[in-house]
Amino acid sequence: MSSSRKQARLDAKTNIESLSVQPYPNSNKVYIEGSRPDIRVPMREISLADSLVGGTKESPIFEPNEPIQVYDTSGVYTDPSYDIDVYKGLPKLRQEWIEERNDTELLDGVSSVYSQERLADETLDELRYGNLPTIRRAKQGQCVTQLHYARQGIITPEMEYIAIRENMGRQKFADEQLNHQHPGHSFGANLPKEITPEFVRREVAEGRAIIPSNINHPEAEPMIIGRNFLIKVNANIGNSSVSSSIEEEVEKLVWSTRWGGDTVMDLSTGRNIHETREWILRNSPVPIGTVPMYQALEKVNGVAENLNWEVMRDTLIEQAEQGVDYFTIHAGLLLRYVPMTAKRVTGIVSRGGSIIAKWCLAHHQESFLYTHFREICEICAKYDVALSLGDGLRPGSVADANDEAQFAELRTLGELTKVAWEYDVQVIIEGPGHVPMHMIKENMDEQLKHCHEAPFYTLGPLTTDIAPGYDHITSGIGAAMIGWYGCAMLCYVTPKEHLGLPNKDDVKTGLITYKLAAHAGDLAKGHPGAQIRDNALSKARFEFRWEDQFNLSLDPITAREYHDETLPQESGKVAHFCSMCGPKFCSMKISQEVREYAKDSEQVALDQAIEIKMIDDPLEGMRQKSEEFKASGSELYHPVVEAE
């Protein structure tokens, strides 16, 4: 191992061991209690400064601003009252809910042959997570999926938790300015003014939403993926044969949840996949997804032709018993679709898709994922693992977008969705890829038509191919658009896409870009309450409350750093201008002066005031401002007077 790799592992290990609670600036962790004491839904509450609304310098009049509550994925990592210990894992939030349903049983040991072999290997003791939980499985004849409960008319604690979480405490806002929202265009989505537990149950029962919640991952805070809810963002992490360690992956997990990752996919392809995944699951407050095919391939030494159902089945059970919440399964790639990719510019770009295509051609038969799909569903139903039906034939270039191969597979995914629903297994559908802007809506329309409104989950899509190093931007454009059209979850893309494995900083950049895209989509489709945070930040901006601007942003740290590059002094935090326009040309300062001018001139309406202000005798205006400046003591800067 190179010295730089050793140092990276050491740094990550140090960060994990010394992990301290680091909440966002001026934010508090708050919990909203549901109908029972153990339903405590976390929110991040951002405290705001008061607004100066009148008075004099000696006797200013202030008006308080309500704190803003925002969706929080960071788990207990930002709760000052919790003592973090990654070696013990997170609290088992859902364990009591699972137990009281009385439809599961505890196993004496692991069922997977591979898991048994790993446990027996003493050389792995130092790598292994030391506090392994007892495995849980559905009792004989029972189904333990949230879809099953929803279809039975049962509102689970998870559903109530989600309803509270999706509303983000917006019911408490009385401020008309904060509540103002433009009507959106939802393209047929059903967006109620308030999310109720019954609405959550109904959406899950109809297959329009999923709650990824493996019974062996009780640490995960319940969340929902669906067209009629807030758009979610997935972050990918994972080691490879040439890069990254267990320590670094756990660090990236915690980092991902801090910056808004609603789910995390572990796409590890290197050594010690099993052990890495255990560490991630025990320390993850969000659902974890995987592509089981990657690990199955490792078990046959990377030779795709040697894959078989027995290896795959054992891998599915292994991961389900560890607590993986959703599997990406490329079961819709059929043998007859492979020739359709021959004329493509970039062929088959999905790793899972290329593995299946190679296997199909080598054996000249349909893949074992397709022929054993019902058995896959039976396994998932025992643990409540959701299926993310993979798009192995997604386009890898804009030239290949929306071709016959892509849409043929999509129609098969729709057929498989109905099969999974027969077993009460939750389903989402994966989508592209690389699609130019004018062709994106067709993807959403086709998915809704052929996949029966099961939630759509897309990688971008990237809207152009010319920007390696900036593909978080090329894809963020497409992500915002398809989110508006109805996509339920967006898989983030980092600046390293097509270039290398992302590091910690890349993960943050990708997540911030995609949280922005998701929020833009929520605004466009008119999700209730989506505009509250925008309104609060805009009000802070107009009132030159700089700290509130930073703290309300998606990335307060970067916002503050950019401001301080040119105005680092504390006086810059109270100045009524920034370095972009300077004190003389700040549009918002001028606008405030226009308002004051109109207020002082009782006979003049606001629109007239603007005209007078701009074209009236400029010399008289300058004389007035000169007198005001002298009267104020000829002070260039006037700090904001703090409320007592």
Curated annotation (Swiss-Prot):
Any Pfam family matching the protein: ThiC-associated
Stored InterPro entries: ThiC (IPR037509), ThiC-associated_dom (IPR025747), ThiC/Bza_core_dom (IPR038521), ThiC/BzaA/B (IPR002817)
Binding residue positions for Zn(2+):
434, 498
Q: List the disulfide bonds.
A: none
Catalytic reaction equation(s): 5-amino-1-(5-phospho-beta-D-ribosyl)imidazole + S-adenosyl-L-methionine = 4-amino-2-methyl-5-(phosphooxymethyl)pyrimidine + CO + 5'-deoxyadenosine + formate + L-methionine + 3 H(+)
Its pathway?
Cofactor biosynthesis; thiamine diphosphate biosynthesis
Q: Which free-text remark accompanies the cofactor?
A: Binds 1 [4Fe-4S] cluster per subunit. The cluster is coordinated with 3 cysteines and an exchangeable S-adenosyl-L-methionine.
Which cofactor(s) are needed, names only? [4Fe-4S] cluster
Q: Which family does it belong to?
A: Belongs to the ThiC family.
Assembly and partners are described as: Homodimer.
From the Swiss-Prot or TrEMBL record, give the protein name.
Phosphomethylpyrimidine synthase
Q: What organism is the protein native to?
A: Aliivibrio fischeri (strain ATCC 700601 / ES114) (Vibrio fischeri)
